[in-house]
Amino acid sequence: SLFELGKMILQETGKNPAKSYGAYGCNCGVLGRGKPKDATDRCCYVHKCCYKKLTGCNPKKDRYSYSWKDKTIVCGENNPCLKELCECDKAVAICLRENLGTYNKLYRYHLKPFCKKADDC
């Protein structure tokens, strides 16, 4: 769910997920769509593609369990869809951390109508 995703992003990046990524670039946030503006935005694009591959669960609402061991996210679900959902969220959180160096505050509240059409996943 969005709750676990936000928690993972906070743990991995130390940033407030809603403030820092809720409307970042063309792909971060609920209304995200379009050609990525930078590496951080590309993380969100790949995350949306990961969600599109899921069947049998609702990425925004369904809760799953994970643990934070030695600064590492460990997904712990028996349900295959929820496990994949957790892995999608884990991947974007790690990607956002790995790209903190190129985070651009100018893209924090980027206007989505100015985004160019992106390739399909």
From Swiss-Prot:
Question: Which CDD domains does the annotation name?
Answer: PLA2c
Q: Where is this site: Cationic membrane-docking site (MDoS)?
A: 112, 117
Give residue numbers for the site Important residue of the cationic membrane-docking site (MDoS). 105, 108
A GO MF annotation of the entry reads: phospholipid binding
What does the UniProt record note about how this protein's activity is regulated? Answer: Rosmarinic acid inhibits the myotoxic activity. Bromophenacyl bromide (BPB) inhibits the myotoxic activity through a covalent binding. Caffeic acid and aristolochic acid, two plant compounds used in folk medicine used to treat envenomation, inhibit the myotoxic activity.
GO BP annotation list: arachidonate secretion; lipid catabolic process; negative regulation of T cell proliferation; phospholipid metabolic process
Put simply, this protein is called: Basic phospholipase A2 homolog piratoxin-1
Annotated source species: Bothrops pirajai (Piraja's lancehead)
